[in-house]
């Protein structure tokens, strides 16, 4: 089976295995991890691979679900190891009506394969497995040891994934001079290498008014109206205040986007008395997360809800509080690190493109490694359809990614 055929087989099998993160109502990664283990052992037997270890670092999560983490290492007798870290979990399919195909049944069209997880993060899993095939079919002597790591829980903070590994088994798995790639990013042409990530702040605002009948707004306080206007004014205020530009990042500005707005009312004739609004903030390293929170605190204190609402119970005041759902500082990799130099050379040799260093707003597991002093490159090739309906990836790009990894090793 050639590389394209193998890529199609692997990607198709993975798409058929639903591994939605349990935090989003899914059953988790166990079945997908079992498939990956099976494929690894098939390669071990087919190519008579020696000096390998395959270890599982599993943990039971708060839902009682087993969350798998796999570390497959081959010792080629080198001082340094190349680690490639992919994640097993996916986000849900979202609004199924927006899909042109079944999200969990692979469909191939115009050289692309469609399905949930096809890009995020099957491209990492598939290219890692293809790399093994390339190494042993070409009988090379790699200049680094190889470590393929497949983790859980990337889509919801990595408490049961890479964070768990680093907190409990760091010295067993990693050395500070190792080379690490996280294939969880990518542009269609593959020249961008992510070396930094914005700070992340997820913040939920709890907006309390007073529930009443829809025909008598003067007896309550419409939390919807307060929430709509609060979110709109805060949105504009944050973008105006924190407006610095840094061209290395994609996008080059901080972002402050309201993503969730919900109340507890299901019938049309009740005015809601409580609304939740969630903002997803991605903050350039120019600013500290504390500065953003300070601005938000002042904004809440000065927000005048009365000018936005015509009829309400004058004895009631809107209450706005918040809780931080997630807060992570920005992180960087030294652009002169060995992994960056090696990856840039490989991109040039395989893709015939000059690598460009960039930062991004999305968070990856690279952050947790960088916080501990490791140099990590986040790289891949993709159609930029992660988390979207009709997620897909070019089949040839799965092979190209493996070829770039191979170029680093040979």
UniProtKB/Swiss-Prot annotation:
| Annotated positions binding Zn(2+) 2 | 120, 155, 387
Entries under Pfam families matching the protein: M20_dimer, Peptidase_M20
Q: Which residues bind Zn(2+) 1?
A: 87, 120, 184
Q: Give any GO molecular function from the UniProt entry.
A: metal ion binding
Entry's cofactor comment: Binds 2 Zn(2+) or Co(2+) ions per subunit.
UniProt superkingdom:
Archaea
EC assignment: 3.-.-.-
Q: Which residues cross the membrane?
A: none
Name the keywords, alphabetized: Cobalt, Hydrolase, Metal-binding, Zinc
Q: Which family does it belong to?
A: Belongs to the peptidase M20A family.
Under NCBIfam families, the record lists:
DapE-ArgE, PRK13983.1
Name recorded for this polypeptide: Uncharacterized metallohydrolase MJ0457
């Amino acid at each position: 089976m050639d590389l394209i055929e193998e890529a199609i087989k692997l990607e198709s099998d993975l798409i058929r295995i639903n591994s939605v993160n349990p935090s989003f109502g899914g059953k988790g990664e166990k079945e997908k991890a079992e498939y990956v283990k099976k494929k690894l052992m098939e390669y071990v037997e087919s190519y008579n691979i020696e000096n390998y270890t395959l270890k599982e670092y599993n943990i039971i999560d708060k839902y009682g679900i087993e969350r798998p983490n796999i570390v497959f290492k081959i010792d080629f007798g080198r001082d340094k190891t190349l680690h490639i870290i992919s994640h097993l979990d996916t986000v849900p399919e979202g609004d199924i009506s927006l899909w042109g195909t079944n999200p969990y049944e692979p469909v191939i069209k115009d050289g692309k394969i469609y399905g949930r997880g096809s890009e995020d993060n099957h491209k990492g899993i598939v290219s890692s497995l293809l790399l093994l095939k390339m190494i042993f079919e070409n009988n090379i002597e790699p200049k680094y040891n190889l470590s393929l790591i497949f983790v859980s829980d990337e889509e919801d903070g990595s408490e049961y994934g890479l964070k768990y590994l680093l907190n409990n088994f760091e010295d067993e798995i990693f050395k500070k001079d190792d080379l690490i790639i996280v294939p969880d990013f990518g542009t269609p042409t593959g020249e961008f290498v992510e070396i930094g990530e914005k700070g992340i702040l997820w913040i939920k605002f709890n907006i309390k008014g007073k529930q009443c009948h829809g025909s008598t707004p003067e007896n309550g306080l419409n939390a919807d109206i307060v929430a709509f206007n609060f979110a709109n004014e805060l949105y504009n205020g944050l973008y105006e205040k924190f407006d610095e530009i840094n061209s290395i990042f994609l996008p080059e500005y901080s972002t402050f986007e309201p993503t969730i707005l919900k109340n507890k009312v299901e019938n049309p004739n009740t005015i809601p008395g409580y609304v939740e609004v969630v903002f997803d903030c991605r903050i350039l390293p120019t600013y500290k997360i504390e500065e953003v929170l300070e601005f938000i605190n002042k904004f809440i204190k000065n927000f005048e809800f009365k000018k936005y609402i015509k009829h309400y119970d004058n004895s009631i005041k809107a209450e706005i509080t918040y809780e931080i759902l997630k807060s992570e500082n920005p992180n960087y990799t030294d652009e002169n690190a060995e992994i960056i130099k090696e990856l840039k050379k490989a991109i040039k040799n395989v893709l015939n493109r000059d690598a460009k260093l960039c930062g991004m707003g999305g968070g990856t597991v690279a952050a947790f490694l960088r916080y501990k002093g490791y140099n990590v490159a986040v790289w891949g090739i993709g159609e930029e359809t992660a988390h979207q309906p009709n997620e897909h990836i070019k089949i040839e790009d799965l092979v190209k990614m493996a070829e770039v990894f191979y170029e680093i090793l040979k």
